[in-house]
């Protein structure tokens, strides 16, 4: 059983039982206690559950909403600096892709001065931010709405994505290393990001310093496929040099 299948079963069990213990999950799913703990950590990180002593409970709807809003304000100065730098790459008449990350939402706020711009996004907040701008056309990718992150997930919109071509794709992730590339914890969102990353002339990674050197559950794309990485000025100097030595273009937003 794949991790995402196991984690879906955990969510289903919690939905039925409100709370469940680690030993119970280990017995029901026939895996080790350490595997269950890893699954619970991944689910908590994605905003689906809350770990409690000896087990886990589902988050209430209002807690899930707060979870995404917490992400928006976390490292907000760094995200805003990255967004402003990213906006300098955008030109009128372009088609761009924005993922559903809070950093991409910060970039969306920088786009209101552009004209005849087409924005393809998997982020509901991003679409809402841009929807009333008459100079910007917004296309949602399609997929399943997840209340914890206000994101469209899955590949229900695969046919649409396969028929688009963007000038730029701006994408964030849970982590990045030269060895593993961009990685994220949400299997379904990662699947969608993989498709989007292939439909652009230029892939730009938007990553604040806390994402560097981090490896998460699922791979989005390799470092070789990234055309530019934009980060903030708190990036570890040794990592910055490693990226440069490997030939990865890096822009530091001030």
Swiss-Prot record:
The keyword Translocase is assigned to this record: no
MF term (GO), any: DNA-binding transcription factor activity
Start-end of DNA-binding region: 20-39
HTH deoR-type domain sequence ranges: 3-58
Disruption phenotype: Cells lacking this gene show a constitutive but glucose-repressible expression of the entire gol operon.
Purpose: Involved in the glycerol metabolism. Repressor of the gol operon for glycerol metabolism.
Name of the protein in question: HTH-type transcriptional regulator GolR
Species: Listeria innocua serovar 6a (strain ATCC BAA-680 / CLIP 11262)
Gene name of this polypeptide: golR
């Amino acid at each position: 059983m794949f991790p995402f299948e196991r984690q879906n079963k955990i969510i289903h069990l919690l939905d039925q039982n409100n709370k469940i213990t680690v030993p119970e999950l280990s017995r029901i799913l026939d895996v080790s206690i350490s595997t269950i703990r890893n699954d619970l950590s991944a689910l908590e990180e994605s905003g689906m559950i809350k770990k409690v002593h000896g087990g886990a409970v589902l988050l209430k709807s209002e807690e899930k909403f707060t979870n995404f809003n917490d992400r928006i304000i976390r490292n907000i100065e760094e995200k805003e600096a990255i967004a402003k730098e990213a906006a300098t790459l955008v030109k009128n008449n372009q088609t761009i892709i924005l993922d559903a990350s809070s950093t991409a939402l910060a970039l969306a706020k920088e786009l209101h001065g552009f004209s005849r711009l087409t924005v393809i996004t998997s982020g509901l907040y991003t679409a809402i931010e841009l929807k009333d701008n008459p100079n910007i056309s917004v296309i949602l990718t399609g997929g399943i709405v997840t209340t914890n992150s206000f994101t469209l997930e899955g590949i229900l919109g695969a046919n649409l994505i396969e028929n688009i071509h963007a000038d730029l794709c701006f994408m964030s992730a849970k982590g990045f290393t030269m060895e593993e590339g961009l990685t994220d914890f949400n299997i379904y969102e990662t699947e969608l990001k993989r498709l989007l990353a292939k439909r652009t002339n230029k892939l730009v990674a938007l990553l604040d310093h806390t994402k560097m050197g981090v490896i998460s559950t699922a791979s989005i794309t390799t470092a070789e496929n990234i055309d530019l990485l934009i980060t903030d000025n708190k990036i570890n100097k040794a990592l910055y040099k490693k990226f440069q030595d490997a030939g990865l273009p890096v822009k530091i937003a001030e």
